[in-house]
Amino acid sequence: MPHIQFLPPEPVVLVSRVADDPDPAGPGLHVAKVAVGDCTIVDARTPCAPLQGRFAVWTVALQLHSPDTPRSLTLRKRYSDFVRFRERLLLCLPPPLRRAVPPLPPPVPWYDAWRYSDVNLDRAWLAARRAGLERFLQQVLLNRALVAAAPVVVRGFLEPPAAHRWVPVRA
């Protein structure tokens, strides 16, 4: 039986906007640097779901501006997380700002869908996808106008999924 490695997301703490903060994006959303690093290949096949495949989880490193000290943040995201982020971003941005949102690297072509795992996990394919994801995040997260126009969507992308949030139980 293959070993499945669970990669829990690291906790994210974003600073809330205070009443006297003139920047609508808030102090916690000033990104200074974005880098998409290597990916981890996750094997999702189980005896109950043998047709599930393997997929890549990307490591995203962010350097945030902070009034006190610079903070860094490391995220782990699948390609589908980037797709959802871009879709939500385009839905909430005004038309003039939508043009500033670059396209994502393309998904596996339909004619290669029958060998999806082979194509999607090819080293050259992954290198091109990593470069495209990094370009996308740099053009979005380093653009203060985009972040200010959609802070809720940006925060949603930077926070771990609800299923991974720890909620204390009250006794």
Curated annotation (Swiss-Prot):
The keyword Membrane applies. It is a peripheral membrane protein. It is found in: Endosome membrane; Vacuole membrane. Disulfide bonds: none annotated. Keywords: Endosome, Membrane, Vacuole. Coiled coil: none annotated. The keyword Transmembrane does not apply. Residues 1-164 form the PX domain. InterPro entries: PX_dom, PX_dom_sf, Ypt35_PX. Belongs to the YPT35 family. The PX domain binds phosphatidylinositol 3-phosphate (PtdIns(3)P) which is necessary for peripheral membrane localization. This is Endosomal/vacuolar adapter protein YPT35. It comes from Eremothecium gossypii (strain ATCC 10895 / CBS 109.51 / FGSC 9923 / NRRL Y-1056) (Yeast). The gene is YPT35.
